């Protein structure tokens, strides 16, 4: 195994590049090395962990790091499976420093040699975004058609959509390419707005990469099985199969994937209509969850996706089969929650249209859903008129008269209008510097406290993040990175100081996996075994754990979390506590 990490520095303004080696020990992976480079160069970095290409399941995530345009602090985002092709370049990390003078595509290829071909090509972005299905998908098709003939094996493409130009929460999208065709199992580095950073700060709309390099990856299954049998009395494959049950198929709930298991178990903890469900009685939440979610939204998913076994991986060999699909529509819990019930949508056809449009535009889907739901509530309570947003309709959010199919379709059409309004800044809807700044400007001009109904975590003066979709205080905790799972998000009540300790522990455990490029869906073994594996392969177990602790401390030293600034945030926590006391009968006096 290599004892150095190879970093390719690329300046998109000139096409100049250089390779630098960093020994394993001072830095172990794309997170701690990315933090070091971001601090020095304000770069956008992406790369893989030390075990990319190995037999360890979930080891091929592509990790992005840098200072986030929407969170306004150091951030980490990751993309499933995209590291498998990246490993064929024979490097560990790419660091972008500088900006192309026009929207461009970065071409990276390594064919039977020591040198990596690095080229920056200008791109007709409007034409690419208009091709085929449009946006991210059209851009991927354009780039593949232009460069496919130069690769001996299938490459991988990273692409952004119009949201990267118009907002601070544009995502980076990708999809496995099989036999020259782009598949439907698209994967995203969504949280953190790195698509906006890639285009606005570096002038790159797409990156295509691939190669033929074969390095010395860890492939000894006998050794790996020995580690797992000593710890779990099971071989690696058996333990991983057990650990990924939820994401494949959980017989306890007769469904699978994050969509299936989470929607089946939410019940009275469901979040709908921008969190207005917080004010419903428990009986109302249970009844509406049963009628709208279980009997319709979830039933459609189970019949169309689970029963037909329409599932795949993110592009790497994996037992989880977590990509649940129907045709081109990929079904994950949080996108289909924020661009679903949170927006008043409980029908798969309506949610598919809205999710696909958001993906094509290149938005972080979770943030988009939170913003759309907030704007819809502003229309419901007349804080804003349709003309203020350049749209023609208002939401249908009356739960007593709600028609699942018809009103879901109506609300989805409204969501599509709002997406166009955001992209083209209609009616003064300018989210280029985030919703907090836009909301404060309207407050000064009109006196409306629009941000009071925006459920979000705040960071510094402008930083923001739509929280993970679980009704628990941990998702609004003052942690240095929010919107991922770097905190405790379980349903149990935990006193504040203990919650802080649990959050810190989760932060360290998630860093431990991300810094080695391991998918968190495999955390059932990864959190325990990764330090042991680093120790066995590199002899640096204690050094790795220390490096993770130092990295967590360095990230936390920049923590600029702001106390909850919206009334909806306060309602979120207060109603959670009331439900724990009155419904869950939690006896804790705190």
Go through each PLM region and give its residues.
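Acidic/Gly/His-enriched mid-domain segments of enzyme catalytic cores or analogous surface patches
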Residues: 37-70, 103-175
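Extended C-terminal regions of large enzymes
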Residues: 4, 9-12, 16-17, 27, ...
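N-terminal short beta-loop-beta anion/metal-coordinating cradle
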Residues: 24, 30-54, 315-321
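Glycine-rich phosphate/pyrophosphate-binding loops
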Residues: 79-118, 195, 200-215, 371
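N-terminal basic/disordered segments at the start of proteins
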Residues: 1-39, 88
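Metabolite-binding pocket within alpha/beta catalytic cores that recognizes anionic/polar moieties
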Residues: 1, 71, 75-82, 367-376
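Alpha-helical support elements that line or immediately flank enzyme active sites
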Residues: 71-94, 181-182, 186, 198, ...
């Amino acid at each position: 195994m290599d004892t150095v990490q190879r970093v390719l520095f690329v300046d998109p303004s000139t096409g100049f590049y250089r390779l630098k080696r960093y020994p394993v020990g001072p830095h172990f992976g794309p997170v701690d090395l990315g933090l070091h480079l971001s601090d020095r160069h304000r770069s956008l970095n992406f790369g893989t962990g030390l075990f990319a290409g190995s037999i360890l399941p979930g080891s091929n995530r592509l990790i992005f790091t840098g200072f986030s345009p929407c969170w306004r602090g150091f951030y980490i985002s990751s993309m499933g499976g995209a590291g498998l092709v990246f490993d064929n370049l024979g490097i560990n990390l790419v660091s972008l420093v500088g900006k192309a003078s026009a929207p461009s595509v970065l071409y990276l290829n390594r064919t039977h040699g020591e040198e990596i071909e690095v080229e920056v090509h200008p791109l007709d972005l409007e034409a690419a975004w208009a091709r085929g299905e449009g946006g991210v998908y059209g851009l991927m098709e354009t780039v593949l058609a232009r460069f496919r003939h130069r690769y001996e094996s299938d490459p991988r493409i990273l692409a952004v959509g119009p949201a990267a130009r118009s907002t601070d929460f544009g995502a980076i999208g990708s999809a496995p390419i099989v036999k020259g065709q782009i598949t439907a199992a698209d994967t995203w580095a969504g949280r953190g707005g790195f698509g906006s950073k890639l285009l606005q700060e570096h002038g790159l709309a797409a990156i295509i990469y691939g190669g033929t390099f074969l390095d010395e990856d860890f492939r000894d299954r006998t050794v790996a099985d020995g580690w797992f049998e000593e710890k779990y009395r099971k071989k690696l494959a058996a333990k991983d199969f057990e650990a990924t049950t939820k994401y494949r198929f959980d017989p306890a709930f007769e469904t699978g994937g994050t969509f299936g298991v989470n929607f089946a178990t939410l019940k009275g903890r469901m979040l709908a209509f921008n969190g207005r469900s917080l004010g419903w009685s428990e009986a109302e939440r249970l009844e509406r969850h049963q009628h709208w979610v279980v009997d319709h939204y979830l039933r459609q998913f189970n019949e169309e996706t689970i029963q037909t076994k329409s599932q795949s991986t993110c592009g790497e060999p994996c037992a989880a089969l977590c990509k649940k699909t129907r045709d081109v529509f990929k079904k994950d819990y949080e996108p289909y929650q924020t661009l679903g019930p949170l927006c008043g949508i409980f029908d798969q056809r309506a949610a598919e249209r809205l999710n696909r449009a958001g993906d094509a535009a290149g938005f972080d889907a979770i943030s988009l859903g939170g913003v759309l739901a907030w704007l819809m509530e502003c229309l419901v309570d007349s804080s804003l008129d349709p003309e203020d947003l350049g749209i023609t309709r208002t939401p249908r959010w009356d739960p007593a008269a709600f028609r699942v199919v018809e009103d879901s379709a109506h609300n989805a059409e409204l969501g599509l209008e709002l997406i166009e309004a955001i992209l083209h800044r209609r009616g003064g809807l300018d989210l280029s510097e985030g919703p907090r700044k836009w909301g404060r400007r309207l407050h000064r001009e009109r006196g409306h406290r629009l941000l009071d109904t925006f459920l979000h975590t705040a960071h510094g003066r402008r930083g923001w993040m739509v929280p993970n979709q679980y009704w628990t205080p941990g998702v609004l905790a003052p942690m240095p990175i929010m919107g991922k799972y770097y905190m405790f998000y379980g349903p149990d009540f935990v006193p504040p100081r203990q919650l802080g300790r649990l959050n810190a522990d989760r932060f360290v455990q998630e860093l431990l996996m991300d810094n080695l490029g391991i998918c968190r869906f495999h955390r059932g073994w990864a959190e325990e075994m990764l330090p042991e594996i680093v120790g066995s392969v590199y002899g640096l177990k204690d050094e790795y754990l220390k490096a993770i602790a130092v990295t967590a401390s360095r990230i936390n030293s920049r923590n600029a979390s702001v106390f909850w600034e919206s009334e909806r945030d306060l309602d979120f926590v207060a109603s959670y506590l009331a439900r724990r006391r009155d419904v869950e009968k939690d006896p804790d006096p705190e």
